[in-house]
Swiss-Prot record:
The lineage of its organism: Eukaryota, Metazoa, Chordata, Craniata, Vertebrata. Keywords: DNA replication, DNA-binding, Mitochondrion, Mitochondrion nucleoid, Transit peptide. InterPro entries: aa-tRNA-synth_II/BPL/LPL, Anticodon-bd, Anticodon-bd_dom_sf, Gly-tRNA_synthase/POLG2, POLG2_C. The gene is POLG2. GO terms for molecular function: DNA binding; DNA polymerase processivity factor activity. GO terms for cellular component: cytoplasm; gamma DNA polymerase complex; mitochondrial nucleoid; mitochondrion. Gene3D superfamilies: Anticodon-binding domain, Bira Bifunctional Protein, Domain 2. This is DNA polymerase subunit gamma-2. It is found in: Mitochondrion; Mitochondrion matrix, Mitochondrion nucleoid. Accessory subunit of DNA polymerase gamma solely responsible for replication of mitochondrial DNA (mtDNA). Acts as an allosteric regulator of the holoenzyme activities. Enhances the polymerase activity and the processivity of POLG by increasing its interactions with the DNA template. Suppresses POLG exonucleolytic proofreading especially toward homopolymeric templates bearing mismatched termini. Binds to single-stranded DNA. GO terms for biological process: mitochondrial DNA replication. It holds the Pfam family HGTP_anticodon. Heterotrimer composed of a catalytic subunit and a homodimer of accessory subunits (POLG:POLG2).
Amino acid sequence: MRSAPAIRACQRICRCLLSGFGGQVDGRQPEQLSKGTGSFVGPVRSQAELPRNEPREAPESGGEGSEPLVEICRKRRFLSGTKQQLSRDSLLNGCHPGLGPLGIELRKNLAAEWWSSVVVFREQVFPVDALHREPGPSLPVDNGFRLVSAETLREILQDKELSKEQLVAFLENLLNTSGKLRENLLHGALEHYVSYLDLVNKRLPFGLAQIGACFHPVSDTKQTPDGVKRIGEKTEASLVWFTSARTASQWLDFWLRHRLLWWRKFAMSPSNFSSGDCQDEAGRKGNRLYYNFPWGKEPIETLWNLGDHELLHMYPGSVAQVHGRDGRKNVVPSVLSINGDLDRGMLAYLYDSFQLTENSFTRKKDLHRKVLKLHPCLAPIKAALDVGRGPTVELRQVCQGLFNELLENGISVWPGYLETVQSSLEQLYSKYDEMSILFTVLITEATLENGLIQLRSRDTTMKEMMHISKVKDFLTKYISSAKNV
């Protein structure tokens, strides 16, 4: 039988192991380790670690989830979950149930714009892909999340023959030999550095870009008592830029300007995006980009000059293999890390686009039109097709033909004509405004007679008549011109 000190040691280690495993977003207690569980995650520290954002306090109340914007995002399927699950902090920390179909499309569009801006139109940036987990032994100070077999852990804990020292040794060995969930994308880029260095014939500068899910510990004493941490998840867009130390400061300034202008490009109120200096515990300097939410500024992207420390740590013993060419000189490059949180960025654009305007559909002055005026490039759905008065079968056939034509040309469409519940045009327009749909195309009996449709704009609420054959070209040019602004 184990001694009391051994039991207390087990409890401390298990509390550490269970961090991130059982924190439920709906406020339930952490789940117990059951026989049906295959693996779970415990915290350790990542080797290639970026300076962290400032820790956040848990929300004082859950009232933030009932605000008008979050309610619209739930109603129109940008976000999934209940009001209680969609508190301010759960959205910022990535501890909510997830995105709805429109939220998925919005984040996909945001990621596509980032990729085009950073990778596609730049000759010195290359895509890279890395595992969600980082293999290999961990360092003693490592406190990132570990992937541990629940069955293996159960066998160790249930072995009553083990002494305190043996139990601790087994558990530490289990942690040290298990893979860890990545907290950022830096480690993967550094792993691929040498192979890409050969690709560019060792010429500096160049960059490696990746978009992927990352995981981080979140403290919330209300949800998870006894110090057990929950797992927060975010979609990170990362550019790791390798340059000589001589030009590192200039490149950091360049990317700071580039990234700030990029965020502002898609905003209704560009001034809500700003930048500021920051510094980590080691004295390394960097910059943060912020969005000014109604409650205050929150970071959405960070830029760091990490020097050569991480690169030399990744490739110990052979400095020559990491040398790049700066003109005629062989140098160990400085590493610039530019990593943006696309989930926070998406939340920023939802707040930026949300407007309450006077409702022209009603004479009641206390009612307002709620509209999400997302940038045309980011809007999840560009057009909605609906039917007015006339023979239903024939009108739906026309809608189906136009639907297929628009999809074939890369224009996302909402098939409102398939709806079986009757709604007034005013109700349809309100619904589509809240879904941030740019244009509503109304197919009526007149379309069957002369080919004319009614086109209604989300931003102006103006309606105009247009021949159905011109709709595709009009939408294509509208979206294309918005990209170039």
